[in-house]
Amino acid sequence: MGVPFVLMIHKFFPMANAFFTSLGFNVVLTDPTSEETIRLSQQLAQSETCYPVKLIYGHMQQLIDQKVDYIFLPTIHTMKHEKSRVKHNYGCVYMQTAAASIAKALDIESKGITLLSPVFDLDFGQEAMASAMLGLSKILGIPKPFCAKALLSGAMAVRRHTAAVEKQGKALLATLRPDDKVLVLITRNYGVSDPILNMGIPELLLERGYKVITLSHLPGHALDISDEYAISI
């Protein structure tokens, strides 16, 4: 089971890894973006997109070269924002189309590779996401009860990962002195953990003496600050 280390995989990999491993698959995650990934992406890209999406070409080609049987890359239709006042929070058009369009551009079917791209409507909650993942049972030829059990393993993996990340954040905050300066990096997960997309900013800040933490390390996701950032229409 090939998994390109791109976009929201930086968030969903703990779930996906536990899910597919529980079903007996060997999970192959591509290496972090490198100069080779960039070179492949520049050669293979067939349209102008944002840089994070363009890098999918290189990551997917690396999985093709490794001769995986499946490539897992979800389609993100809507996002979940706890305090949003709009009816639906849609992902950008590339998140909705990149998996299928790039798989087609690289013609993975002719190479014997099947794309698994469940549609995640995250603003409908965990049940909708679970339904999308269970829909893979037919493609994989695995009974739904087995997939449901694997999905529970995925959910537990997410809880453990989230707790571990927040524990790291609390440990850092506990070491702070009153005059310490801490910078919180607020971006998508891939904007922090991808070594190319983060442009070395975390390391640069550390070199300048700042303590750096990401939004995922902070347990304040339920805090409602919408009144401070509401847009008047």
Question: Whereabouts are the PLM-identified features?
Answer:
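An N-terminal assembly and electron-transfer interface module characteristic of large anaerobic redox
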Residues: 1-233
